[in-house]
Amino acid sequence: MKKFKNISITFLILISLGVLNSCESVLEVEPESSISDEQFWKTNEDAKLGLAAAYDALQKAYRTKRFYWGEFRADNYVNSEKPQPDTQDLINNNLTPESSTEYLQWDEFYSLIFRANLAIEKIPEIPYYDTQYLGEAYALRAFAYFDAYRVWGGVPLFTKAELTFSDDAIKPRSSAQEVLDLVLSDIEEAEKNLTVVSSDYTFSKLSLLAFKAQVHMYLNEYEAANTALTSLIASNQFSLTTNRKQWRDLFLNDEINYPGEGQEGPELIMSIRYDFEEDGNRASGIYQVFFPGVPSYYVAPNLVEEWETKFPTDSTAWATKYPNVPPHVFEENEDTGELNAKYGDYRYYESIAAPGTQEEDLRISKYHKVNISPSIDDTNIILFRYADMLLLKAEALNQLGQPTEAIELVNQIREARELPLVNSGTIPDVVNINDKDELEDFILSERRLELLAEGYRWWDLVRTNKAVEVMGPINGLTQDRIIWPLWFRHLIDNPKLEQNVPY
């Protein structure tokens, strides 16, 4: 995918949007060859190269934003003694239009949208064009606009590749509903055109089903979400990992402790791929965001408490709750080579580490186990994973009045993770499966543990209308501040933009 990424397709210009500084700071990609628009889009190979440019923009747009948007406004983290503005404003619910460009600036998103627009315009002009490429372009545009919808609500809506300076290029915000309507329409167009069943790093029929399910779950459209999830699961293309190493290898990119391991597994539906040799320094943003040398945040104590209450790490507490369940976590004694039992959930030990001398110095260790320079980071970002899909389906089934089937899906994951089944201990899980609200909270808790540091928790709280309930007592979040502010510079550069209330 990426080896073609440095070939420029056209002289790319978008003004206004508040993307950069008026006429002198347009959104542009300098042409590296003299190939013109008219000369280029002639063959399916050209279409493939054009899409490579769009996926390159996807890499840049999501390298840190996926985590700043989906993780740090939720209850998984607390500030450290040396907080940094990037995360402090998020954790404290102190967002302003002057907050970090890491999560408020939308330049790279419109670069992605422009490149998708260009492909959507030009591919149908190619004789005997491959509809797969057109489907990918629609899927990429839908993906970008859906996140814009979740973050800002209404945004300037571009459906054509604007190539000239004109008044039409300076647009006000469309309504949130108009943005959502385009997302849903683009998903339909992608469905009509995609032909590839599955692909690790590009949109396919199955990754589109995963995306479609996420969209409908966000909109509380449970029948539609369940239909998409049923089709995805019935494909039998994906399965759960069944041991600690397999689960760890889904995420791990740690050449110091685990050279040559990780970034693969049967649960991965689609990821954004990064490669240091192809993409250069700081290609991915995971090392930058998680496990930094001087942490600006720690894993929240209430998350640790929730995890250890469900799956005790103390042998006595485990034996009390699960007297007939032996531990499945073992670690080798470095001196004797003996395997010693550890109690609890191996996901806990793989996801959280305490490298410092203080017990509360807990950091995310899901992707790497020690501090590694962000300059060499090429960790893939997982967009869709099978366990996420099963838990979404469990949620949907609960809302559709099928709690027993919902618990069966939760137990599929528990069994795969070598954990006791729901309500199997002498101290039952705190859930009445016949109470829809209780079961929803329980499934969200299972998601919190399984999907930690993957960019889901904040959006889970928002889509289930629990953001204020959970975060209000922690940082004073109110309903009107769930939406994000527009970056102040975008408002200066485009006077037609209006700021979100109450910012």
Curated annotation (Swiss-Prot):
Stated induction or repression of this protein's expression: By ulvan and rhamnose.
Stored Pfam families: SusD-like_3 (PF14322), SusD_RagB (PF07980)
Entry's localization field: Cell outer membrane
Task: Please name the InterPro entries in this protein's record.
Answer: SusD-like_N (IPR033985), SusD_RagB_dom (IPR012944), TPR-like_helical_dom_sf (IPR011990)
Q: Which residues form the signal peptide?
A: 1-21
Indicate whether Membrane appears among the record's keywords.
yes
Q: Which UniProt keywords apply?
A: Cell outer membrane, Coiled coil, Membrane, Signal
Q: Which GO terms describe its cellular component?
A: cell outer membrane
Function description: Polysaccharide-binding protein probably involved in ulvan degradation. Ulvan is the main polysaccharide component of the Ulvales (green seaweed) cell wall. It is composed of disaccharide building blocks comprising 3-sulfated rhamnose (Rha3S) linked to D-glucuronic acid (GlcA), L-iduronic acid (IduA), or D-xylose (Xyl). The SusD-like protein may mediate ulvan oligomer-binding before transport in the periplasm for further degradation.
Please give the family membership noted in the entry. Answer: Belongs to the SusD family.
* Protein name per the record: SusD-like protein P38
Organism of origin: Formosa agariphila (strain DSM 15362 / KCTC 12365 / LMG 23005 / KMM 3901 / M-2Alg 35-1)
